[in-house]
């Protein structure tokens, strides 16, 4: 007998003796007891303590205690019997309740009899108590399964299971039970009206939807616990447990896998905050193999679509994170931890790289087929991911795959024809020679980027430039394009062009895929030497020399180029030693206009000395010592404020003056001096007008703002007007916009506000605040305090609008404050007389100008309509000079709209032709804004007045290229051409800013000699005008004349882009196609250039026809096209290879006329004429490995096959037979172009991401748990249908069997002697 059964244990309530009691006999000392001791004495000592015996009497046998009871022995026998039955069923192939290879089971034996648990109705409290017992492993599952609470909702069950950490096997049992109960209920309700498959589909979908909903909620909860480590740890435990639940349901097929896959991909797509990326990617890795491993035939298309979608999403996320500067969003970090940020960013990018690489190496290449606009963005990233850390042996294979994908994404299909140069060889190209860039004339670029030119003319906000530069500026010839744009005479009004080009180059140098600095410098100096070789007339047409000098000096300031490098190249070129060379003059003029430092003195003087024999004045007037002497003589002049004729000095002297004067006014004045209106305007004129050093003005602007030297609101108004006038340069040249604006707003709201209440209430800065918010929105988002300041000023401006109309007392108090006369009653004042008197004082009494202006602004704010009426009368009277009106506009007392309403257009034309900075820059700002709003009306009024011809031309040239005004510009120029009936306006616009005599050009075609990428917009207008006014017969001659005048110019397609008339387009297409087909069999380089340009022109023209099905083909052209196709089809393979480029261009005609040609082929097939189809098929087989060509032909043949199938749906056309060549067309994929030795198998297991299976048993070889069984009909000896047991019908039975309750699956089949056999019924 075990002694443990009779081991005495002390009672729990008895307190043990402690060592603190003295170790003496208690009999010798009196007993001092406590109340507690009395209680112990009564309960235990008095009554005694004993343990009851296990048997009734000591005399009874102890056999039952020593040996196990009969029920226990019976239970053991039952377990062994169950094992015997299991073995017997498996051996003799009876219906098995357990499949040997089915590892999704949790127990070895479930029994044949199956009984759903009884459902009982419980209160919410008892239901939760039942779930708590389920989560406890101490509670027997057999006890719990006798009854299941009724009314559990799916979401409630799942939430309780992960919050209470119910063991996984119990969760699975509960989910299976709920599945089975719901399934049984659904069958009884359906009554045979709904199929079994539909019921199961609904059941699985409902549960899966709830599962993913909870998972989404759990992922988003992470943001709540960032600052609470305890809650964050608990959240991790909960989501880990839930993922184990979900993972087991996924493996056991207790959810709809395709729904989960679709949700996961969509969820990854929609998350934007970086804080959710790690967990989302972790979840994706868990189910990664499932998403990629779908192989069922019925879901193959769906899975393929999902993988394509997933690939694009992963590339998009990679692009977003790569471009992001900060991944951390934590309130604890005022300045983000750089190391932590970079580590997190690299970790996420690494996981994304693993996913993308795994898809690339294990899936079909079609996974990366995407819309062209997306491909242009993600292409570079895919190259970067896949070619990183790749051995030299694998690189060619990877590049071939990438080339295939690139060809497919860029293949020419209907609606996606592209006239841009192809870039499939490499994402970036930085090495070039000028011969590769120019074709003939220096501005005749072989490749022009219209998008780049449009952005340069129209502008982007500061934050958009980085993204645009990374994506769009990928070739070195684009650097030449933007330089030529900046120095072109037609862009000389762009004061910011030099700094804009410099910023683009600096951003490109610092970008991930950067150009090397030495490469850029080499291209710039090569371009300068190219300019020196041009004649004087050619140079005047393409370069405005002051802007070229300014651009190079800006480059020098940014460190993009270096003058010593230029001098060394100049000496080594030998130009200085040529007798009487114009090159020397060009280089010497350039050198004396560059920034020269004292350390370059000897080199600089040496160059000038070398030309003394032919041009001695360069050294005599501009040697370095002479430059310093002139600079020293100008210092007193600058300090006295005499800035006249400074612009006549060479650029080197102007730079010296600008740098010295900036240091003088900022650092050498001793005590800080406040600035006034006069000082601000004069400094602007000096730096921006006389010296042309914009960046020095903005350096001074930062200085006076940070030192708070503007102590008057009127001065601040003048200052902000200048910043608005230089809006583009403000975005480029202010170093820290946030700090600048915060300081400016602080001065405005805290200091200046209390100094002059009247000025604060009357002077409006709303236009400047709006400008900043519009162009610097991303900067405002980065700083919460700046957001609050901006919100505060906008709220103030909003209240100011109705301030005076709703509060007349405020008007009176301000009036008394301005006048300083407390006895004056505002109500007694005559409103018109107040305006009239103060206008006179403003115009003629400078000492009273400030107060009078405030009174007029008060009148305007309190009685706006009466004020404007009086000014309209004032303008109609004409008692003023233009200079006086200009001053009123500058002081914001008069608007252009008031003059416009009086129909005083002569006066309006006079004003818009004026340029004035004497009273600030508000006049220029108002004029520019007014012209943009009324561009068409103003230009037409200027046209009707010949005296303003120069103003008209200047306005058309300056505003015409702007995309927002392009349509109005076209209308105005077309109107002028119709009215004048000659080309004089075009001629004037073409030579604007060139400083050359107006050449007499009577022939329209001669004007096309001036065509270049900077004036393409003007020739688009001219071409559209001429085409509209030409008949069909003249169009052919007109097109041929243009081609003859400009040669094979890549701009030819662009000048026809505005033509949209259907008849004119069709006529031009016929003309182009005839010329194209006449030379398509020529292989000379010039012929290929001609074919390329002709086809690009046809593509541009065809885009204007929305309904391409109506775009027919001339019968003569069609026959010529068919004969040409037949000629190519008859060529041997070796010969055909020489014509790949010709054939590529030819097939674009098929795309343009696709529906027409498909219809023609179909009609030919009706007449049993397969000649053209056979020729296309022959070409498809003979083109070899020309991937792009093969894709085009395959697309054509598949389109033709689809067209025939669609047309023959009608019963009447069933007699038409599909051509045999189309039936033989193979199933085609882009991976078909891979060579046999470069198959995808080599990359099958490469870069597979480490997958985390939370709580899921890993298997050596995954088996499909959904085994296919078939019901066998013994009478017919055939398999009738597939039989499948659903996963939830494998529910473990823990209950006692009830009579009459039998499982409706396994045992029911057993009664009919059915068997589950894994045999193929076929």
Swiss-Prot record:
InterPro entries: Mediator_Med12. Belongs to the Mediator complex subunit 12 family. Component of the SRB8-11 complex, which itself associates with the Mediator complex. The keyword Transcription applies. Pfam families: Med12. SMART domains: Med12 (SM01281). Residues 1-21 are annotated as: Disordered. Coiled coil: none annotated. GO terms for biological process: regulation of transcription by RNA polymerase II. GO terms for cellular component: mediator complex. Keywords: Activator, Nucleus, Repressor, Transcription, Transcription regulation. The keyword Repressor applies. GO terms for molecular function: transcription coregulator activity. Component of the SRB8-11 complex. The SRB8-11 complex is a regulatory module of the Mediator complex which is itself involved in regulation of basal and activated RNA polymerase II-dependent transcription. The SRB8-11 complex may be involved in the transcriptional repression of a subset of genes regulated by Mediator. It may inhibit the association of the Mediator complex with RNA polymerase II to form the holoenzyme complex. It is found in: Nucleus. This is Mediator of RNA polymerase II transcription subunit 12. It comes from the Eukaryota.
């Amino acid at each position: 007998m075990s002694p443990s059964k009779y081991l005495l244990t002390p009672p729990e309530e008895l307190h043990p003796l402690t060592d603190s009691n003295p170790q003496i006999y208690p009999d010798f000392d009196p007993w001092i007891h406590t109340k507690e001791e009395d209680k112990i004495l009564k309960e235990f000592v008095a009554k005694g303590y004993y343990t009851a015996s296990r048997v009734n009497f000591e005399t009874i046998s102890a056999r039952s205690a020593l040996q196990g009871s009969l029920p226990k022995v019976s239970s053991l026998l039952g377990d062994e019997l169950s094992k015997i039955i299991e073995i017997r069923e498996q051996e003799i192939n009876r219906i098995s309740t357990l499949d040997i290879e089915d590892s999704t089971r949790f127990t070895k034996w479930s029994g044949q009899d199956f009984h759903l648990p009884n459902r009982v109705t419980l209160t919410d409290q008892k239901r939760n108590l039942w779930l708590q017992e389920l989560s406890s492993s101490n509670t027997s599952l057999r006890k719990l399964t006798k009854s299941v609470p009724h009314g559990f909702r799916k979401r409630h069950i799942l939430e309780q299971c992960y919050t209470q950490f119910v063991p996984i096997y119990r969760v699975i049992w509960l989910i299976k039970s709920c599945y089975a109960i719901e399934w049984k209920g659904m069958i009884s309700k359906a009554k045979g009206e709904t199929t079994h498959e539909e019921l199961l589909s609904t059941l699985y979908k409902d549960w899966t939807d709830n599962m993913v909903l909870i998972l989404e909620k759990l992922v988003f909860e992470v943001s709540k616990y960032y600052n609470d480590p305890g809650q964050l740890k608990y959240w991790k435990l909960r989501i880990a447990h839930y993922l184990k639940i979900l993972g087991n349901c996924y493996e056991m097929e207790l959810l709809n896998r395709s729904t989960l896959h679709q949700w996961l991909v969509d969820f990854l797509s929609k998350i934007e905050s970086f804080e959710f990326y790690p967990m989302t990617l972790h979840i994706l890795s868990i189910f990664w193999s499932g998403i990629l491993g779908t192989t069922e035939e019925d879901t193959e298309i769906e899975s393929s679509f999902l993988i394509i979608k997933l690939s694009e999403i992963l590339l998009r996320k990679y692009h977003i994170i790569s471009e992001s500067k900060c991944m951390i969003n934590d309130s604890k970090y005022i300045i983000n931890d750089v190391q932590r940020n970079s580590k997190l960013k690299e970790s996420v990018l690494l996981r994304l790289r693993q996913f993308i690489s795994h898809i690339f190496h294990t899936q079909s290449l079609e996974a990366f087929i995407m819309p062209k606009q997306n491909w242009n963005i993600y292409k570079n990233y895919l190259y970067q991911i896949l070619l990183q850390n790749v051995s030299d042996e694998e690189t060619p294979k990877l590049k071939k795959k990438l080339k295939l994908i690139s060809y497919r994404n860029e293949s020419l299909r209907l609606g996606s024809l592209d006239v841009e140069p192809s870039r499939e060889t490499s994402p970036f190209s930085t090495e070039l020679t000028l011969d590769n860039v120019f074709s003939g004339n220096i501005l005749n670029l072989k490749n022009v980027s219209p998008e780049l030119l449009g952005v340069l003319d129209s502008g982007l906000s500061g934050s958009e430039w980085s993204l645009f530069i990374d994506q769009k500026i990928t070739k070195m010839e684009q650097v030449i394009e933007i330089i030529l744009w900046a120095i072109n005479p037609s862009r000389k009004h762009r004061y910011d062009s030099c700094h804009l080009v410099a910023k683009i180059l600096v951003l490109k140098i610092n970008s991930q895929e950067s150009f090397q600095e030495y490469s850029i410098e080499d291209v710039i100096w090569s371009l300068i030497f190219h300019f020196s070789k041009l004649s004087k007339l050619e140079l005047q047409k393409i370069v405005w020399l002051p802007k070229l000098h300014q651009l190079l000096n800006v480059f020098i300031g940014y460190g993009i180029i270096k003058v010593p490098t230029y001098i060394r190249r100049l000496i080594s070129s030998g130009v200085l030693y040529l007798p009487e060379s114009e090159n020397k003059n060009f280089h010497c003029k350039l050198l004396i206009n560059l920034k020269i430092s004292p350390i370059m003195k000897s080199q600089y003087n040496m160059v000038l000395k070398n030309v003394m024999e032919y041009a001695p004045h360069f050294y005599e007037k501009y040697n370095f010592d002479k430059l310093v002497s002139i600079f020293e003589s100008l210092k007193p002049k600058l300090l006295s404020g005499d800035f006249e004729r400074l612009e006549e000095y060479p650029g080197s002297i102007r730079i010296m003056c600008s740098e010295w004067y900036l240091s003088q006014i900022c650092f050498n004045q001793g005590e800080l001096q406040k600035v006034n209106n006069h000082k601000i305007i004069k400094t602007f004129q000096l730096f921006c007008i006389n010296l042309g050093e914009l960046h020095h003005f903005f350096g001074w602007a930062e200085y006076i703002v940070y030192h708070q030297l503007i102590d008057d609101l009127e001065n601040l108004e003048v200052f902000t007007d200048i910043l608005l006038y230089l809006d583009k340069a403000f975005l480029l040249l202010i170093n820290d916009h946030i700090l600048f604006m915060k300081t400016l707003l602080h001065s405005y709201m805290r200091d200046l506000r209390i100094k002059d209440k009247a000025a604060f209430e009357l002077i409006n800065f709303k236009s400047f605040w709006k400008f900043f918010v519009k162009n610097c929105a991303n900067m405002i988002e980065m700083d919460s305090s700046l957001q609050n300041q901006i919100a505060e000023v906008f709220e103030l401006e909003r209240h100011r609008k109705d301030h005076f109309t709703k509060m007349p007392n405020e008007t009176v108090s301000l009036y008394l404050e301005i006048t300083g006369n407390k006895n004056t009653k505002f109500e007694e004042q005559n409103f018109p007389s107040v305006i009239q008197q103060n206008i006179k004082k403003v115009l003629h009494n400078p000492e009273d100008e400030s107060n009078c202006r405030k009174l007029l602004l008060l009148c305007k704010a309190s009685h706006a309509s009466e004020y404007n009426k009086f000014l309209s009368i004032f303008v109609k009277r004409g008692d003023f000079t233009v200079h006086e009106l200009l001053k009123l506009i500058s002081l914001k007392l008069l608007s252009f709209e008031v003059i416009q309403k009086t129909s005083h257009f002569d006066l309006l034309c006079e004003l818009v032709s004026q340029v004035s900075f004497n009273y600030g820059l508000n006049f220029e700002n108002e004029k520019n804004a007014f012209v943009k709003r009324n561009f068409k009306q103003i230009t037409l009024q200027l046209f009707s007045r010949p005296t303003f011809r120069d103003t008209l031309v200047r306005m058309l040239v300056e505003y015409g290229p702007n995309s927002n005004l392009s349509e109005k510009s076209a209308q105005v120029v077309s109107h002028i051409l119709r009215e004048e009936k000659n080309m004089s306006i075009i001629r004037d616009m073409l030579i604007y800013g060139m400083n050359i005599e107006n050449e007499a050009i009577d022939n329209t075609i001669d004007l096309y000699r001036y065509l270049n990428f900077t004036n393409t917009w003007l020739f688009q207008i001219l071409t559209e005008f001429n085409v509209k006014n030409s008949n069909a017969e003249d169009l052919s001659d007109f097109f041929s004349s243009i081609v003859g005048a400009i040669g094979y110019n890549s701009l030819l397609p662009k000048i026809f882009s505005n033509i949209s008339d259907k008849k004119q387009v069709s006529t031009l297409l016929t003309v182009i196609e005839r010329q194209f087909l006449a030379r398509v069999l020529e292989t000379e380089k010039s012929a290929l250039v001609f074919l390329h340009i002709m086809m690009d022109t046809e593509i541009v023209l065809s885009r204007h026809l929305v309904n391409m099905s109506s775009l027919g083909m001339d019968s003569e052209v069609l026959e010529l096209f068919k004969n040409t196709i037949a000629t190519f089809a008859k060529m041997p393979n070796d010969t055909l290879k020489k014509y790949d480029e010709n054939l590529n261009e030819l097939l674009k005609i098929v795309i343009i006329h696709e529906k027409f040609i498909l219809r023609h082929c179909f009609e030919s097939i009706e007449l049993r004429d397969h000649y053209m189809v056979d020729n296309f098929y022959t070409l498809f087989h003979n083109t070899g490995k020309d991937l792009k060509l093969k894709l085009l032909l395959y697309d054509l043949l598949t389109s033709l096959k689809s067209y025939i199938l669609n047309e023959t749906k009608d019963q009447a056309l069933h007699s038409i037979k599909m051509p045999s060549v189309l039936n033989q067309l193979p199933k085609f994929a882009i991976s078909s172009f891979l060579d046999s030795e470069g198959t995808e198998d080599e990359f099958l297991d490469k870069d597979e991401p480490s997958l985390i299976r939370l709580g899921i048993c890993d298997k050596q070889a995954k088996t499909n748990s959904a085994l296919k069984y078939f019901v066998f009909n013994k009478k017919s000896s055939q398999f009738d249908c597939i039989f499948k047991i659903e996963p939830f019908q494998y529910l473990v039975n823990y209950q006692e069997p009830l009579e009459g309750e039998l499982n409706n699956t396994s045992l029911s089949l057993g009664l009919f002697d059915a068997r589950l056999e894994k045999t193929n019924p076929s």
